[in-house]
């Protein structure tokens, strides 16, 4: 540890000029740091991930490569190993718990039932029995109550066997101790605590030991003096969240937590059974390609070896890491908190809605897993071959290759891993302003790291020479900061489909092209942090304001306000749903009255379900649109491509398909009004003629 501390101080001296043997007091660090770290706008320290923060300690050229190797060995690899072991532990406990419940079906069925004569359930009794057995203090319970609940378990041999086995599968010396709010939890939360708290501390021991040496208080003072207070705070925040495994700030009151959950629910409603998102996830397959051992040609060669490729694919898909990603919402910060809020939740309406929204993430999770296995299989096998050539044994090569695969996956896919989440994203403000920006933030960081490696003439991890590193980094910058966004939005808006129409609508194509370009710019801006999000909103507000000012007829001022509300993405979503619902009701008033109430195409259903979804987060509008999509996908009047895209989640609006039934009703109403007008005109003529005749006859 002394050598590690000495080496880090030498690195600081090389990068910052601060003498490696000197010490800086807290006050001196604060005074010196107050002048540093300002005007970092593109991915500032508060929006960096852990590795991005480490990049500040890396010098230029060969020295920079040595610095990178130091952090790789001391921090990055131990961290990735710790997460792999944690995933294995969590999956092992989950499997054992599932097996336990199968072995004791009668016990499982009565766990939530109340014990006769007591205000407690059998599940409470099991937990209290184990806590009492291991001499844990149980907050809020009297000795009499503890003895009564323990006796229930002791006098029921099956329940006792269940409880004792439960302690074994928790893989701890004693059953996890209760907290002050233990009544809000259950056996599942106890097992989660066994891994996320106690178990986490064990598997992260090596990483944490190195962190304590490298980022000691003395060294943090030097860091503050060199990089500023905001940098030091961002680093400490990231290290704390990595240690605890929690992204939500601690100490928030119940109302703040409830509001945050409500906002997260808005994100969940958008992602509910989002098939289009699952399909677009497959774009990330190319994230595993590089200019080294998994280039286009070697990846193709691995795919050509079909038996080995599918064996690796299945191994990855069924690995503990990938199972963890689909076992909870581990791909999105807001989604992960939504899932966390369910732990120990009772069957209240709020808990039921949250559970529904969590289940709605499943298609996206499966899409994410398929993309990882499909792109990762060739990467993994090529990396195994690389390590075998370097002299590693088969087992060592496979283990090291999987750790590399895990690192690439977590850094290029969406991830809610605390070290991959910035201080901004983890804050209450970030949950609202940076919602849906998990992956764009990752991409911006990749692009920034690539630029810094080129600028400082460093060889990036995975490259064997400077030229290979430079080519790879130019490719990363081009793809992650430009091409990926353009491709994504052209697919999301179905712009590609419109270009293949027999009679392409140039005006619609131009409109979608503008949207694609603006959205791509917004992705880079929002992915750079809160400041970029503000710039994005102001840009879009000015554009929308000018659009409405240029309209000669019926300008929509609410659209300008709507753009401003997009600073808080979930609030903007709710605002659009309510505004669009009101517009639908106003513009289609006569159509709604003319059509049958229970006609699925009646605009009233689109409007009302949007209003309900906006207010309650219950994804009724998503369900309504899914039903229509399935019906339209079976409609032979549409082209094969249109039907396929409708089935995969693209809307009629995305594909430029008009709602013919509503259009026909509008035409019918228009014709009816025209005929009514003619009739009125004719009647008026008759009345006028009669009046003239009466006057001529002297009446």
Named regions from a protein language model:
Residues 15-16, 58, 226, 316-322, ...:
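Short, aromatic- and cysteine-enriched interfacial helices/patches
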Residues 21-25, 29-33, 87, 91-112, ...:
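Flexible coil/linker segments and helix-coil junctions enriched in charged and small residues
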């Amino acid at each position: 540890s002394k050598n590690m501390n000495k080496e880090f101080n030498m690195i600081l001296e090389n990068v910052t000029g601060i003498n490696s043997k000197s010490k800086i007091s807290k006050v001196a660090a604060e005074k010196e740091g107050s002048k540093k770290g300002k005007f970092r706008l593109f991915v500032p320290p508060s929006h960096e991930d852990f590795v991005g923060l480490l990049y500040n300690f890396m010098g230029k050229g060969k020295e920079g490569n040595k610095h990178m190797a130091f952090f790789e060995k001391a921090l990055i690899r131990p961290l990735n190993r710790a997460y792999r072991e944690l995933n294995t532990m969590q999956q092992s406990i989950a499997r054992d718990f599932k097996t336990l419940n199968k072995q004791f079906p009668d016990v499982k069925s009565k766990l939530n039932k109340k014990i006769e004569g007591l205000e407690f359930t059998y599940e409470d009794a099991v937990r209290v029995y184990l806590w009492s057995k291991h001499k844990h203090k149980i907050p809020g319970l009297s000795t009499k109550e503890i003895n009564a609940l323990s006796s229930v378990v002791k006098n029921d041999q099956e329940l006792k066997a269940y409880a004792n086995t439960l302690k074994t599968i928790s893989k701890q010396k004693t059953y996890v101790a209760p907290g002050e709010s233990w009544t809000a939890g259950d056996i599942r939360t106890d097992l989660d605590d066994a891994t996320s708290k106690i178990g986490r501390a064990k598997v992260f021991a090596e990483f944490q030991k190195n962190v304590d040496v490298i980022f000691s208080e003395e060294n943090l003072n030097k860091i503050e003096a060199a990089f500023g207070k905001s940098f030091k705070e961002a680093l400490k925040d990231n290290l704390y969240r990595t240690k605890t495994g929690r992204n939500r700030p601690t100490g928030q009151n119940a109302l703040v937590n409830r509001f945050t959950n409500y906002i997260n629910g808005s994100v969940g409603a958008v992602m509910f059974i989002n098939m289009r998102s699952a399909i677009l996830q497959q774009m990330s397959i190319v994230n595993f390609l590089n200019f080294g051992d998994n280039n286009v040609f070697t990846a193709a060669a691995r795919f050509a070896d079909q038996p080995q490729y599918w064996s690796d694919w299945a191994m990855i898909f069924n690995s503990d890491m990938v199972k963890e990603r689909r076992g909870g919402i581990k791909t999105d910060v807001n989604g992960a908190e939504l899932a966390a809020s369910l732990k120990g939740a009772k069957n209240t309406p709020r808990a039921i809605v949250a559970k529904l929204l969590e289940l709605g993430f499943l298609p996206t999770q499966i899409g994410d897993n398929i993309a990882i296995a499909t792109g990762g299989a060739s990467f993994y096998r090529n990396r195994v071959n690389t390590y075998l050539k370097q002299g590693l044994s088969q087992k060592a090569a496979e283990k090291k290759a999987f750790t590399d695969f895990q690192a690439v996956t977590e850094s290029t896919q969406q991830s809610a891993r605390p070290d991959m989440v910035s201080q901004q994203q983890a804050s209450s403000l970030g949950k609202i302003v940076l919602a849906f920006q998990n992956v764009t933030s990752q991409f911006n960081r990749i692009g920034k790291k690539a630029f810094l490696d080129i600028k400082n003439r460093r060889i990036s991890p995975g490259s064997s020479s400077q030229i290979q590193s430079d080519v790879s980094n130019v490719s990363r910058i081009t793809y992650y900061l430009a091409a990926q966004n353009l491709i994504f939005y052209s697919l999301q808006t179905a712009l590609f489909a419109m270009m293949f129409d027999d009679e392409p609508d140039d005006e619609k194509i131009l409109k979608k092209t503008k949207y694609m370009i603006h959205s791509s710019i917004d992705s880079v801006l929002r992915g750079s942090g809160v400041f970029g999000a503000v710039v994005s909103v102001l840009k879009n507000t000015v554009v929308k304001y000018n659009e409405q000012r240029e309209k000669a007829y019926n300008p929509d001022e609410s659209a300008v306000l709507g753009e401003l509300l997009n600073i808080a993405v979930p609030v903007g979503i709710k605002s659009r749903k309510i505004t669009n619902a009101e517009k639908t009701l106003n513009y289609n008033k006569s159509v709604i009255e003319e059509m049958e109430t229970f006609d699925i195409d009646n605009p009233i259903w689109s409007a009302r379900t949007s209003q309900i979804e906006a207010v309650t987060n219950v994804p009724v509008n998503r369900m309504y649109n899914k039903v229509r999509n399935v019906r339209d996908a079976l409609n032979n009047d549409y082209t094969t491509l249109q039907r396929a895209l409708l089935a995969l989640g693209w809307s009629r609006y995305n594909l430029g398909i008009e709602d013919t039934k509503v259009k026909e009703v509008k035409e019918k109403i228009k014709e009816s009004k025209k005929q009514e007008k003619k009739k009125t005109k004719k009647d008026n003529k008759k009345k006028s003629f009669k009046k003239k005749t009466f006057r001529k006859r002297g009446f």
